[in-house]
Amino acid sequence: MTCYVNKIRTYKNFPIKGINYLDLNGIYLDNSSRDHLVEDCIQKIHPFLESFDYFGLIEARGFLVGSILADRLNKGIVQLRNKLGRLPDETKKVDHELEYGKAQLEVQTGSGSVL
């Protein structure tokens, strides 16, 4: 884990005062760091592989690493959008809390068992 932690930059008081934004771009730019992050995630997820069919990827940060995980673990992807109204067909909305407020995620119905 330590090989990529030093690639994370922290921006204090962003996007609002009292919140520290963790910028993962340093990990994304370095292939070795990105690979170590993905391998660490796989180790943590491995005991649960049989309990879900899809990775639920929250835009936009979740799309990057989640796509790699889904590919390596032979799982599908379900998009969880935080900008409502961007998915066609029937959807469900789920309330959730952020560090600085409340929000909703939207997912298409019939998406199966999602982690």
Ranges and model annotations:
Residues E50, L73-K75:
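Short glycine/proline-enriched coil/turn segments at helix->beta-strand junctions
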Residues M1-S51, Q108:
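Active-site-facing substrate-recognition patch
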Residues A60-G62, K83:
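Short glycine-rich anion-binding loops that position phosphate/pyrophosphate groups of nucleotides
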Residues K7, G62-F63:
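Generic non-transmembrane alpha-helix signal with a bias for helix starts/N-cap capping motifs
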